[in-house]
Structures are given as C-alpha cells and as structure tokens.
Amino acid sequence: MATRDTRPVSWIAAARKAFEDFPVDARDTIVDALTVAADGGMARIVKPMKGLGSGVFEVALRHRGNAFRVVYAVQIDDDVWVVHAFVKKSTQGIRTPRNDIDLIKDRLKKLRVALQ
C-alpha cells in the first residue's frame, strides 16, 4: 500500500508508448522498480546513469534474451519522471547507445523547461 510520502510516477508520452510494447511480465518487473523509486528507494535492477547528472537512473532488466531499459529522473519535479524506454541492441557491450543518450538528454532538457 502506498504511503503518503509516495511520489507519483509520470511519463513522457513517447516513453510510455515504447514501454507498452514490452512483454507484460517485463513491464510488471519494471513497474515494481518504479514503485520502489516512488517510495524513495532503489530496486536492485536500478543503477545511476553516468553522465546525465544526479538523480537520473536506469532500470536494467534482462528478460528472455533481451535487455529492456527504462530511464527515470527523480530531481526534476515532485514526481518520478520516466523519460525513455527502449530495448537495448547495443553492439558496444554494456554501453548505452549514443542515440539513446542524446534522446534522454534532450527529453530531460525539454521536461525541465516545461515544468518551470
């Protein structure tokens, strides 16, 4: 049950749309991780995103041979903001592809402006 300290989870529309294409059981696991974030914690499948500033985290889930990723920010507003969801297909090992990093940066910038 949610406490009164639980923060709302808000989504950028494009991130929500991409997330809805994930398999149901992968979505359920990721929603559980986002719920932990909303309660002020950090699930074991979450790690800070390097190079994007403090308060930006990545949910990293390996599921049925795929690498599902959801990026969220906790220091933009009172909400936990999900800014990107994607299936990682990097040929660079564990590194997040540059185009995804650029997209995350752009969405974070636009979100900060929109919420001012």
Regions from the PLM with identified roles:
Residues M1-A67, I76-D79, V87-Q116:
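Basic, Lys/Arg-enriched alpha-helical interface segments
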Residues V83:
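Electropositive, glycine- and tryptophan-enriched low-complexity nucleic-acid-binding patches
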